[in-house]
Structure formats: C-alpha cells, structure tokens
C-alpha cells in the first residue's frame, strides 16, 4: 500500500482519485501532480512502482502544503480573525455563518440542533 503524506492510498483506485484522499489535494491538483511526476492518471495504485511513489511523495512534500500543515494554517487563519475581532472572527466565535447567509431560518448546520423554548403554562 502506497503511503504518501501520512495517508494510506486505497490500492484498487486510480492514482488520480487516490491522491484526493490526502487533505488539500483535489482532482485538479491531483492531475497537476501526476503530470509533473510523469505518471499515467489511469494507473491503479497497486500497479505503481516504488520509484513512481517516491517521485509523487517528493513532489507533494516539496511543492504543496497538505494534511497537518494545511489544517494548522487554516486554524491559525481563523484564530487570527477571532483575535483581531473582525466581523468574520466574531461569526466564527459565535458559531454562526460567516459568509453572509441568512440565519432567521436555515443555518442549522452551523448553529446545531434547535433549542426549543417551552410554551408558557396557564
């Protein structure tokens, strides 16, 4: 099993798809990496040679921020927004939508389950 950036790639998938299992690599970036490495995107992971795997690993480590480093950078960006107290930071802190979506209805994913208020008894 090929292990790149701390992720075990699924053996039965095409390399182009398998690389997307790494956080920070999508389909277009996967194609870009394979072109640089000179690997056929239709090759299955189990059919990759050790040389090809090491070439892919080297390209990803050198040129792209993936997995832990990328997660850390995103977390630091959000923390910075919170620390400077800007609108986006406040929305992150309150757990509300950040990009201007409506909140009177919807926004349940961001706000969590409804907190129902009991009706006043007579």
Swiss-Prot record:
Q: Which GO terms describe its biological process?
A: translation
A single Gene Ontology CC annotation of this entry is: small ribosomal subunit
* Compositional bias (Basic residues): 101-122
Keyword line: Ribonucleoprotein, Ribosomal protein, RNA-binding, rRNA-binding, tRNA-binding
Residue ranges, annotated region (Disordered): 97-122
| InterPro entries, per database record | Rbsml_uS13_C (IPR027437), Ribosomal_uS13 (IPR001892), Ribosomal_uS13-like_H2TH (IPR010979), Ribosomal_uS13_bac-type (IPR019980), Ribosomal_uS13_CS (IPR018269)
Q: One of this protein's Pfam families, by short name?
A: Ribosomal_S13
MF terms per GO, please? rRNA binding; structural constituent of ribosome; tRNA binding
> What is annotated about its quaternary structure and interactions?
Part of the 30S ribosomal subunit. Forms a loose heterodimer with protein S19. Forms two bridges to the 50S subunit in the 70S ribosome.
**Family from the record:** Belongs to the universal ribosomal protein uS13 family.
- Any idea what job this protein has? Located at the top of the head of the 30S subunit, it contacts several helices of the 16S rRNA. In the 70S ribosome it contacts the 23S rRNA (bridge B1a) and protein L5 of the 50S subunit (bridge B1b), connecting the 2 subunits; these bridges are implicated in subunit movement. Contacts the tRNAs in the A and P-sites.
What's the protein here called? Answer: Small ribosomal subunit protein uS13
According to its UniProt entry, this protein's organism is: Caldanaerobacter subterraneus subsp. tengcongensis (strain DSM 15242 / JCM 11007 / NBRC 100824 / MB4) (Thermoanaerobacter tengcongensis)
């Amino acid at each position: 099993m090929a292990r790149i950036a701390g992720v075990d790639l699924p053996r039965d998938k095409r390399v182009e798809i398998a690389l997307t299992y790494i956080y920070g690599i999508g389909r277009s970036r996967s194609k870009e990496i394979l072109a640089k490495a000179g690997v056929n995107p239709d090759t299955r992971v189990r059919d990759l040679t050790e040389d090809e795997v090491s070439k892919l690993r080297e390209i990803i480590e050198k040129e792209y921020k993936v997995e832990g480093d990328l997660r850390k950078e995103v977390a630091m960006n959000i923390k910075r927004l919170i620390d400077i107290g800007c609108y986006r930071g406040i929305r992150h802190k309150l757990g509300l939508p950040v990009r201007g979506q409506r909140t009177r209805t919807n926004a349940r994913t961001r706000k969590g389950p409804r907190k129902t208020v009991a009706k006043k008894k007579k």
